[in-house]
Design a protein with these regions (language model features):
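Non-ligating segments of multi-cofactor redox enzymes
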Residues: 1-245, 255, 265, 269-272
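Short linker/helix segments within small regulatory modules
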Residues: 247-260
Length: 272
């Protein structure tokens, strides 16, 4: 049963958040929301432990479609970074602000960039593209993520500065437009650079929050050097080009690891 510790801990964390928010906010939705997400993630981990081929994809679809279709389109909640800025500026700790605090600001201290690997609805689509591992050298254009970050902040700030009326409706259409833009750029970059995760590496503004916190992540893939034969197979299949043979926190692209475990599946010696 020890092998099921990780999914049990992950489920316990999300259930704790669910109960805490339900009690403090007096809203049963939080119990459903975080319980559903926690169960979906735990299910994916259990399927991985049982060597199910599409374990991570199951969780991606369960969580990604729930947040995109149900929360975003049906409930009309902008769960993108613009939604976070919007609720932050209004001083309301709801929806996107809670989502960002749990999944993208403090959550990475526990599970690193796990959001990117198991729940992001943008990556959910991009992972269906043909370039599972990058076929070109990494580009030095990661600074573009800060441009997108600043633009999203300026956009929402402008709504308040110029006292735009019906901000809720504007934010809903910003969610739709923003997602269409992300998908267009993500698919375009994937084919341009032959890399499904090019958008994640160069443009995604959310990584401005994720990367610094992921440096301290408790949940990390580590290498048992007594088993490693330096075959390089782990690096060849890594979608984020992380050097998994280096256990230090300063390893190459260390804050990029999305916990997809493709490296562990490819390792012939089970060193990861």
């Amino acid at each position: 049963m020890k092998k099921y510790l990780a999914p049990a801990v992950m489920l316990a964390v999300f259930e704790t958040v669910a109960v805490t928010l339900t009690v403090t906010k007096h809203n049963l939705f939080y119990l459903f929301n975080f319980s559903y997400i926690g169960c979906s993630i735990a299910l994916g981990l259990v399927l991985f432990i049982r060597r199910h081929r599409h374990a991570r994809r199951v969780t991606q679809l369960l969580v990604g479609l729930y947040m995109l279709v149900y929360l975003g389109l049906i409930c009309r909640e902008n769960m993108q970074i613009e939604g976070f800025w919007y609720y932050l500026f209004t001083g309301v700790f709801e929806a996107a602000t809670i989502h960002y605090v749990v999944a993208k600001i403090f959550g990475p201290l526990l599970f690193g960039r796990g959001w990117c690997g198991y729940a992001c609805w943008t990556a959910m689509v991009l992972d269906f593209l043909p370039y599972k591992a990058p076929r070109q050298p990494r580009k030095n254009i990661g600074w573009l993520r800060y441009v997108f970050f600043a633009v999203s902040l300026a956009f929402v700030g402008g709504l308040f500065l110029f006292q735009v009326s019906d901000k809720e409706n504007v934010m809903f259409w910003a969610f739709i437009t923003g997602n269409l833009l992300y998908y267009a750029l993500g698919i375009g970059l994937a084919f341009l650079f032959q890399d499904n995760r090019a958008f994640c590496k160069y443009l995604c503004p959310v990584t401005v929050f994720l990367k610094p916190m992921s440096y301290f992540s408790l949940l990390r893939v580590k290498c048992d050097h007594s088993k490693c034969v330096s075959c390089g197979k782990c690096q060849k299949v890594c979608p984020m080009e992380v050097d998994m043979t280096d256990n230090s926190r300063k390893r190459k692209n260390g804050t990029e690891c999305i916990l997809c475990f493709e490296c562990a599946k490819a390792c012939p010696k089970k060193a990861l």
